[in-house]
């Protein structure tokens, strides 16, 4: 089956270990020439089973890399199964923000919930949330990337 670039809603990269190098690779992919053919709202997501860096370090590293560079396609969610927090990226009022939220041991379900929101929109997300119960996230840190 052939998938046209315009039908891609998001990409998920799965790594055994989230490292600074894995973050750099994700950013290179999201800013590649191929990414320019994807819809503007396409998000790049990263899921790892473990990590060598903290969510705070991930955000600071992304800020360093994007300090002088262009952002072609945004990031969606970065999560490692050994973290207590989840990183969710948001664009509002011409700002590109990384939110570090307390995940409350929801584990990978928080990652999947955010993907559902990205891909299917708020109606599907809220429909599922109403059936399984609300998710509670407490913001811990906020990083303005741009």
Task: Locate the predicted segments by residue.
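Intrinsically disordered, low-complexity Ser/Thr/Pro/Gly-rich regulatory segments
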Residues: 1-146
């Amino acid at each position: 089956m052939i998938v046209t670039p315009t039908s891609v809603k998001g990409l998920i990269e799965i790594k055994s270990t989230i490292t600074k190098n894995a973050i750099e690779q994700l950013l290179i992919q999201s800013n590649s020439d191929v990414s320019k053919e994807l819809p503007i709202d396409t998000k790049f997501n990263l899921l790892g089973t473990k990590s060598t860096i903290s969510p705070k370090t991930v955000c600071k590293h992304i800020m360093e890399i994007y300090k002088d560079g262009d952002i072609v396609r945004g990031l969606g969610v970065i999560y490692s199964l050994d973290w207590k927090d989840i990183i969710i990226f948001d664009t509002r009022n011409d700002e590109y923000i990384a939110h570090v939220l307390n995940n409350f041991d929801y584990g990978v379900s928080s990652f999947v919930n955010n993907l559902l929101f990205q891909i299917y929109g708020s109606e599907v997300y809220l429909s599922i949330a109403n059936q399984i119960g609300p998710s509670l996230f407490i913001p811990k840190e906020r990083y303005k990337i741009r």
